[in-house]
Amino acid sequence: MGRFISVSFGLLVVFLSLSGTGAGLDCPPDSSLYRYFCYRVFKEHKTWEAAERFCMEHPNNGHLVSIESMEEAEFVAKLLSNTTGKFITHFWIGLMIKDKEQECSSEWSDGSSVSYDKLGKQEFRKCFVLEKESGYRMWFNRNCEERYLFVCKVPPEC
């Protein structure tokens, strides 16, 4: 009876540790898996548009990262904190104001709507970054032609 309980408990631990992680899905090298998507930090300075185009040219058609929950925001913040140097302060994310006249028409570059937001102090600029000063947890808008590092979010290989 004791052996049965030990085996059952062991299987339960394995199941719980794999559930919700996208187990069985493969990410490219240097990428991290979180809830069925692969995230990769690129240490190349690009404009917002060039970074988005770069992500879309990935074999799985990715986009600049969209952040749709507090949990995902924490994951991305930890990913950036673990991969950055002391002088790296900004990363492009996939949020953009679509129409200069209507700030409320923001959406993610992957087409998803903004259901969670962590907007910091805003200026009238169209593209958004995560900033080191906020622990990479707040979104700030910047001129789209500035060059920053970026994070791509792509579907994994099945």
From Swiss-Prot:
One Gene Ontology term, aspect cellular component: extracellular region
Tissue: Expressed by the venom gland.
Main subcellular localisation: secreted
N-terminal signal peptide: 1-24
Residue ranges of every copy of the C-type lectin domain listed in the record: 34-153
KW Heme (keyword) present: no
Subcellular location: Secreted
SMART domains: CLECT (SM00034)
Disulphide connectivity of cysteines: 27-38, 55-152, 127-144
Keywords assigned: Blood coagulation cascade activating toxin, Calcium, Disulfide bond, Glycoprotein, Hemostasis impairing toxin, Metal-binding, Secreted, Signal, Toxin
Assigned protein family: Belongs to the snaclec family.
Miscellaneous comment in the UniProt entry for this protein: Binding to prothrombin and protein C (PROC) is hardly detectable.
Oligomer and partners: Heterotrimer; disulfide-linked. The heterotrimer consists of 1 heavy chain (a metalloproteinase) and 2 light chains: LC1 and LC2.
Protein purpose: Regulatory subunit of the blood coagulation factor X- and IX-activating enzyme. The enzyme activates coagulation factor X (F10) by cleaving the Arg-Ile bond and is also able to activate coagulation factor IX (F9) and protein S (PROS1) by specific cleavage of Arg-Ile and Arg-Val bonds. May serve as an exosite by which the enzyme recognizes and binds to the Gla domain of factor X (F10) and factor IX (F9) in a calcium-dependent manner.
Protein name as it appears in the record: Snaclec coagulation factor X-activating enzyme light chain 2
